[in-house]
């Protein structure tokens, strides 16, 4: 459950290290984001000399959440951290690598490029 003011780790190699959610796209005013949802975020911490700088406004897709994600078959999955991957307007990742596992729910949102870059899909 990601809402505005939530801090997230960045799971790619764009140079950003930490994001803060400022808007959840889709839904109404009180909507919270979960795995596979797109957010607007600001970069709070970044590596020097990389394409993404501190205080940049970026689009990102949630790939891991600490809140349980219920699946249709009755199981649920939970991760140790909240993490996102920075994407462009066409929903393709801006980085060339994705770190850590990602949830299978990304397949429903047509984020197949992120799934193919991820080392593990849970």
From Swiss-Prot:
Subcellular location: Plastid, Chloroplast
Gene Ontology molecular function terms on file: large ribosomal subunit rRNA binding; structural constituent of ribosome
InterPro entries recorded: Ribosomal_uL14, Ribosomal_uL14_bac-type, Ribosomal_uL14_CS, Ribosomal_uL14_sf
Keyword Plastid attributed: yes
Assigned GO CC terms: chloroplast; cytosolic large ribosomal subunit
GO biological process: translation
Keyword tags: Chloroplast, Plastid, Ribonucleoprotein, Ribosomal protein, RNA-binding, rRNA-binding
Signal peptide span: none
Matches recorded under Pfam families: Ribosomal_L14
Keyword Plastid recorded: yes
Summary of subunit composition and partner proteins: Part of the 50S ribosomal subunit.
Reported function: Binds to 23S rRNA.
Protein family per UniProt: Belongs to the universal ribosomal protein uL14 family.
Protein name: Large ribosomal subunit protein uL14c
């Amino acid at each position: 459950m990601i809402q505005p003011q939530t801090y997230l780790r960045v799971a790619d190699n764009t140079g950003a290290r930490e994001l803060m959610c400022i808007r959840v796209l889709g839904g109404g005013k009180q909507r919270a984001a979960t795995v596979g949802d797109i957010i607007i975020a600001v970069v709070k911490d970044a590596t020097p000399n990389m394409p993404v700088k501190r205080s940049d406004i970026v689009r990102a897709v949630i790939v891991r959440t600490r809140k349980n994600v219920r699946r249709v078959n009755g199981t649920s999955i939970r991760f140790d951290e909240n993490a996102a991957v920075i994407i462009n307007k066409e929903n393709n990742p801006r980085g060339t690598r994705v770190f850590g596992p990602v949830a299978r729910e990304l397949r429903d949102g047509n984020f197949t490029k992120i799934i193919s870059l991820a080392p593990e899909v849970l």
